[in-house]
C-alpha cells in the first residue's frame, strides 16, 4: 500500500481454503500498454517499452497512448491491456479497447474479441477509467 495519492493497479487474488476465502491484495504501477499491429513493432509483442501509455496526474485524467505507428482495422485495430503478474502470456485476459460506439471502454473479460474502433497512423488512444470512456483521435 502507499500513502501517496495517484493511480495504481489493484490486484485482488482470492483463494479458497476449506470454507474460508483468503484474499491477497497488491498495488502495482498502473502500466497500460498499446498492443497489436498499430504499435512500433507492428506485432503482438508484450510489454513493448514504446507502447506504454502516459499516466494522468489527476483523478479524472486520461491515460494516453503513444501515436499509432501503423494503421489498424478489424482484428488489427488498436488494443490496450495491463499485465497481471504471472499472466504475461495471456495479456488479453486484461485487455480493453475503445468499443464500437467510439466513446466507451470495452473490457474483454472471458469473452472473445469485441468489435472495436479502427485506428490510423498518428492517432492516439485516450482512456478515462474514472468515467469509463475512451476515444481514438
List the predicted regions and their residue ranges.
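C-terminal edge beta-strand
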Residues: 14, 21-27
Amino acid at each position: 500500500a502507499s500513502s501517496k495519492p495517484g493511480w495504481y493497479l489493484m490486484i485482488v487474488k482470492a483463494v479458497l481454503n476449506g470454507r474460508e476465502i483468503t484474499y491477497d491484495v497488491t498495488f502495482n504501477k498502473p502500466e497500460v500498454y498499446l498492443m497489436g499491429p498499430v504499435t512500433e513493432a507492428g506485432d503482438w509483442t508484450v510489454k513493448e517499452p514504446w507502447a506504454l501509455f502516459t499516466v494522468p496526474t489527476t483523478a479524472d485524467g486520461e491515460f494516453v497512448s503513444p501515436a499509432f505507428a501503423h494503421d489498424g482495422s478489424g482484428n488489427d485495430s488498436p488494443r490496450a491491456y495491463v499485465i497481471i503478474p504471472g499472466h504475461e502470456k495471456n495479456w488479453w485476459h486484461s485487455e480493453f479497447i475503445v468499443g464500437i460506439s467510439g466513446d466507451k471502454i470495452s473490457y474483454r473479460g472471458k469473452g472473445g474479441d469485441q468489435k472495436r474502433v479502427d485506428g490510423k497512423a498518428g492517432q492516439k488512444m485516450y482512456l478515462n477509467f474514472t468515467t469509463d470512456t475512451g476515444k481514438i483521435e
